[in-house]
């Protein structure tokens, strides 16, 4: 009987050790929220952001990464992007779940510049690769750091880089 108890205790300890060392799959909790976030960007469904983001959502976009701290500013950013690029689309290429509070997404964005934005519409299509680090807490998105090549994007729209010494002549 003593051997059975010792053997059972040993098996229980080994089982607990293996279970506690297993990496948790955060994707099952986070993927549905990410899919709704992508819906906001890809379809312009801004109301869904009320459900999945915190009021003080912090958006940081290159090159300055200056914080825009509010859900309303996020909605404005998405709305302005979709106004300038009505067919704007984010395609997720890869997801790396860091923890239950952060995921890194590698993506490709595409869009045709048909609407007014920071410049008159060019009618040209552009695409760029980039990545986002998206942060979570208690089942809601709390922020995103977003990076891509602005230069790649604007060159595809037909903009040219002019060195300062040429502009001065």
Feature locations, PLM:
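A solvent-exposed, acidic/Ser-Thr-rich amphipathic alpha-helical stretch
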Residues: 46-99
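A short, structured loop/turn motif at beta-sheet edges
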Residues: 95-103, 135-142
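A short acidic/glycine-rich loop-to-helix N-cap element
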Residues: 24-25, 118-123, 152-160
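Exposed beta-sheet edge and beta->alpha loop/turn motif
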Residues: 108-141
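A mature extracytoplasmic/lumenal domain signature
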Residues: 63, 108-111, 148
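Short, low-complexity N-terminal intrinsically disordered segments enriched in polar/charged residues
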Residues: 20-55, 164-169
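Low-complexity, intrinsically disordered terminal/linker segments enriched in charged
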Residues: 142-169
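Bacterial Sec-dependent N-terminal signal peptides
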Residues: 1-28
């Amino acid at each position: 009987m003593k051997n059975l108890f010792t053997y059972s205790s040993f098996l229980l300890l080994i089982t607990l050790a293996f279970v506690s060392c297993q990496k948790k799959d955060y994707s099952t909790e986070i993927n549905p929220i990410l899919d709704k976030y992508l819906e906001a960007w890809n379809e312009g469904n801004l109301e869904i952001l009320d459900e999945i983001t915190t009021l003080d959502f912090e958006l940081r976009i290159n090159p300055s990464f200056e914080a825009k701290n509010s859900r309303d500013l996020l909605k404005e950013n998405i709305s302005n992007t979709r106004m300038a690029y009505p067919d704007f689309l984010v395609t997720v290429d890869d997801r790396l779940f860091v923890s239950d509070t952060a995921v890194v997404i590698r993506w490709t964005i595409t869009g045709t510049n048909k609407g007014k934005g920071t410049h008159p519409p060019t009618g040209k299509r552009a695409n760029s690769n980039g990545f986002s680090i998206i942060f979570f807490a208690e089942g809601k998105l709390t922020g995103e750091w977003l990076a891509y090549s602005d230069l790649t994007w604007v060159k595809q729209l037909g903009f040219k880089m002019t060195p300062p010494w040429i502009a001065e002549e």
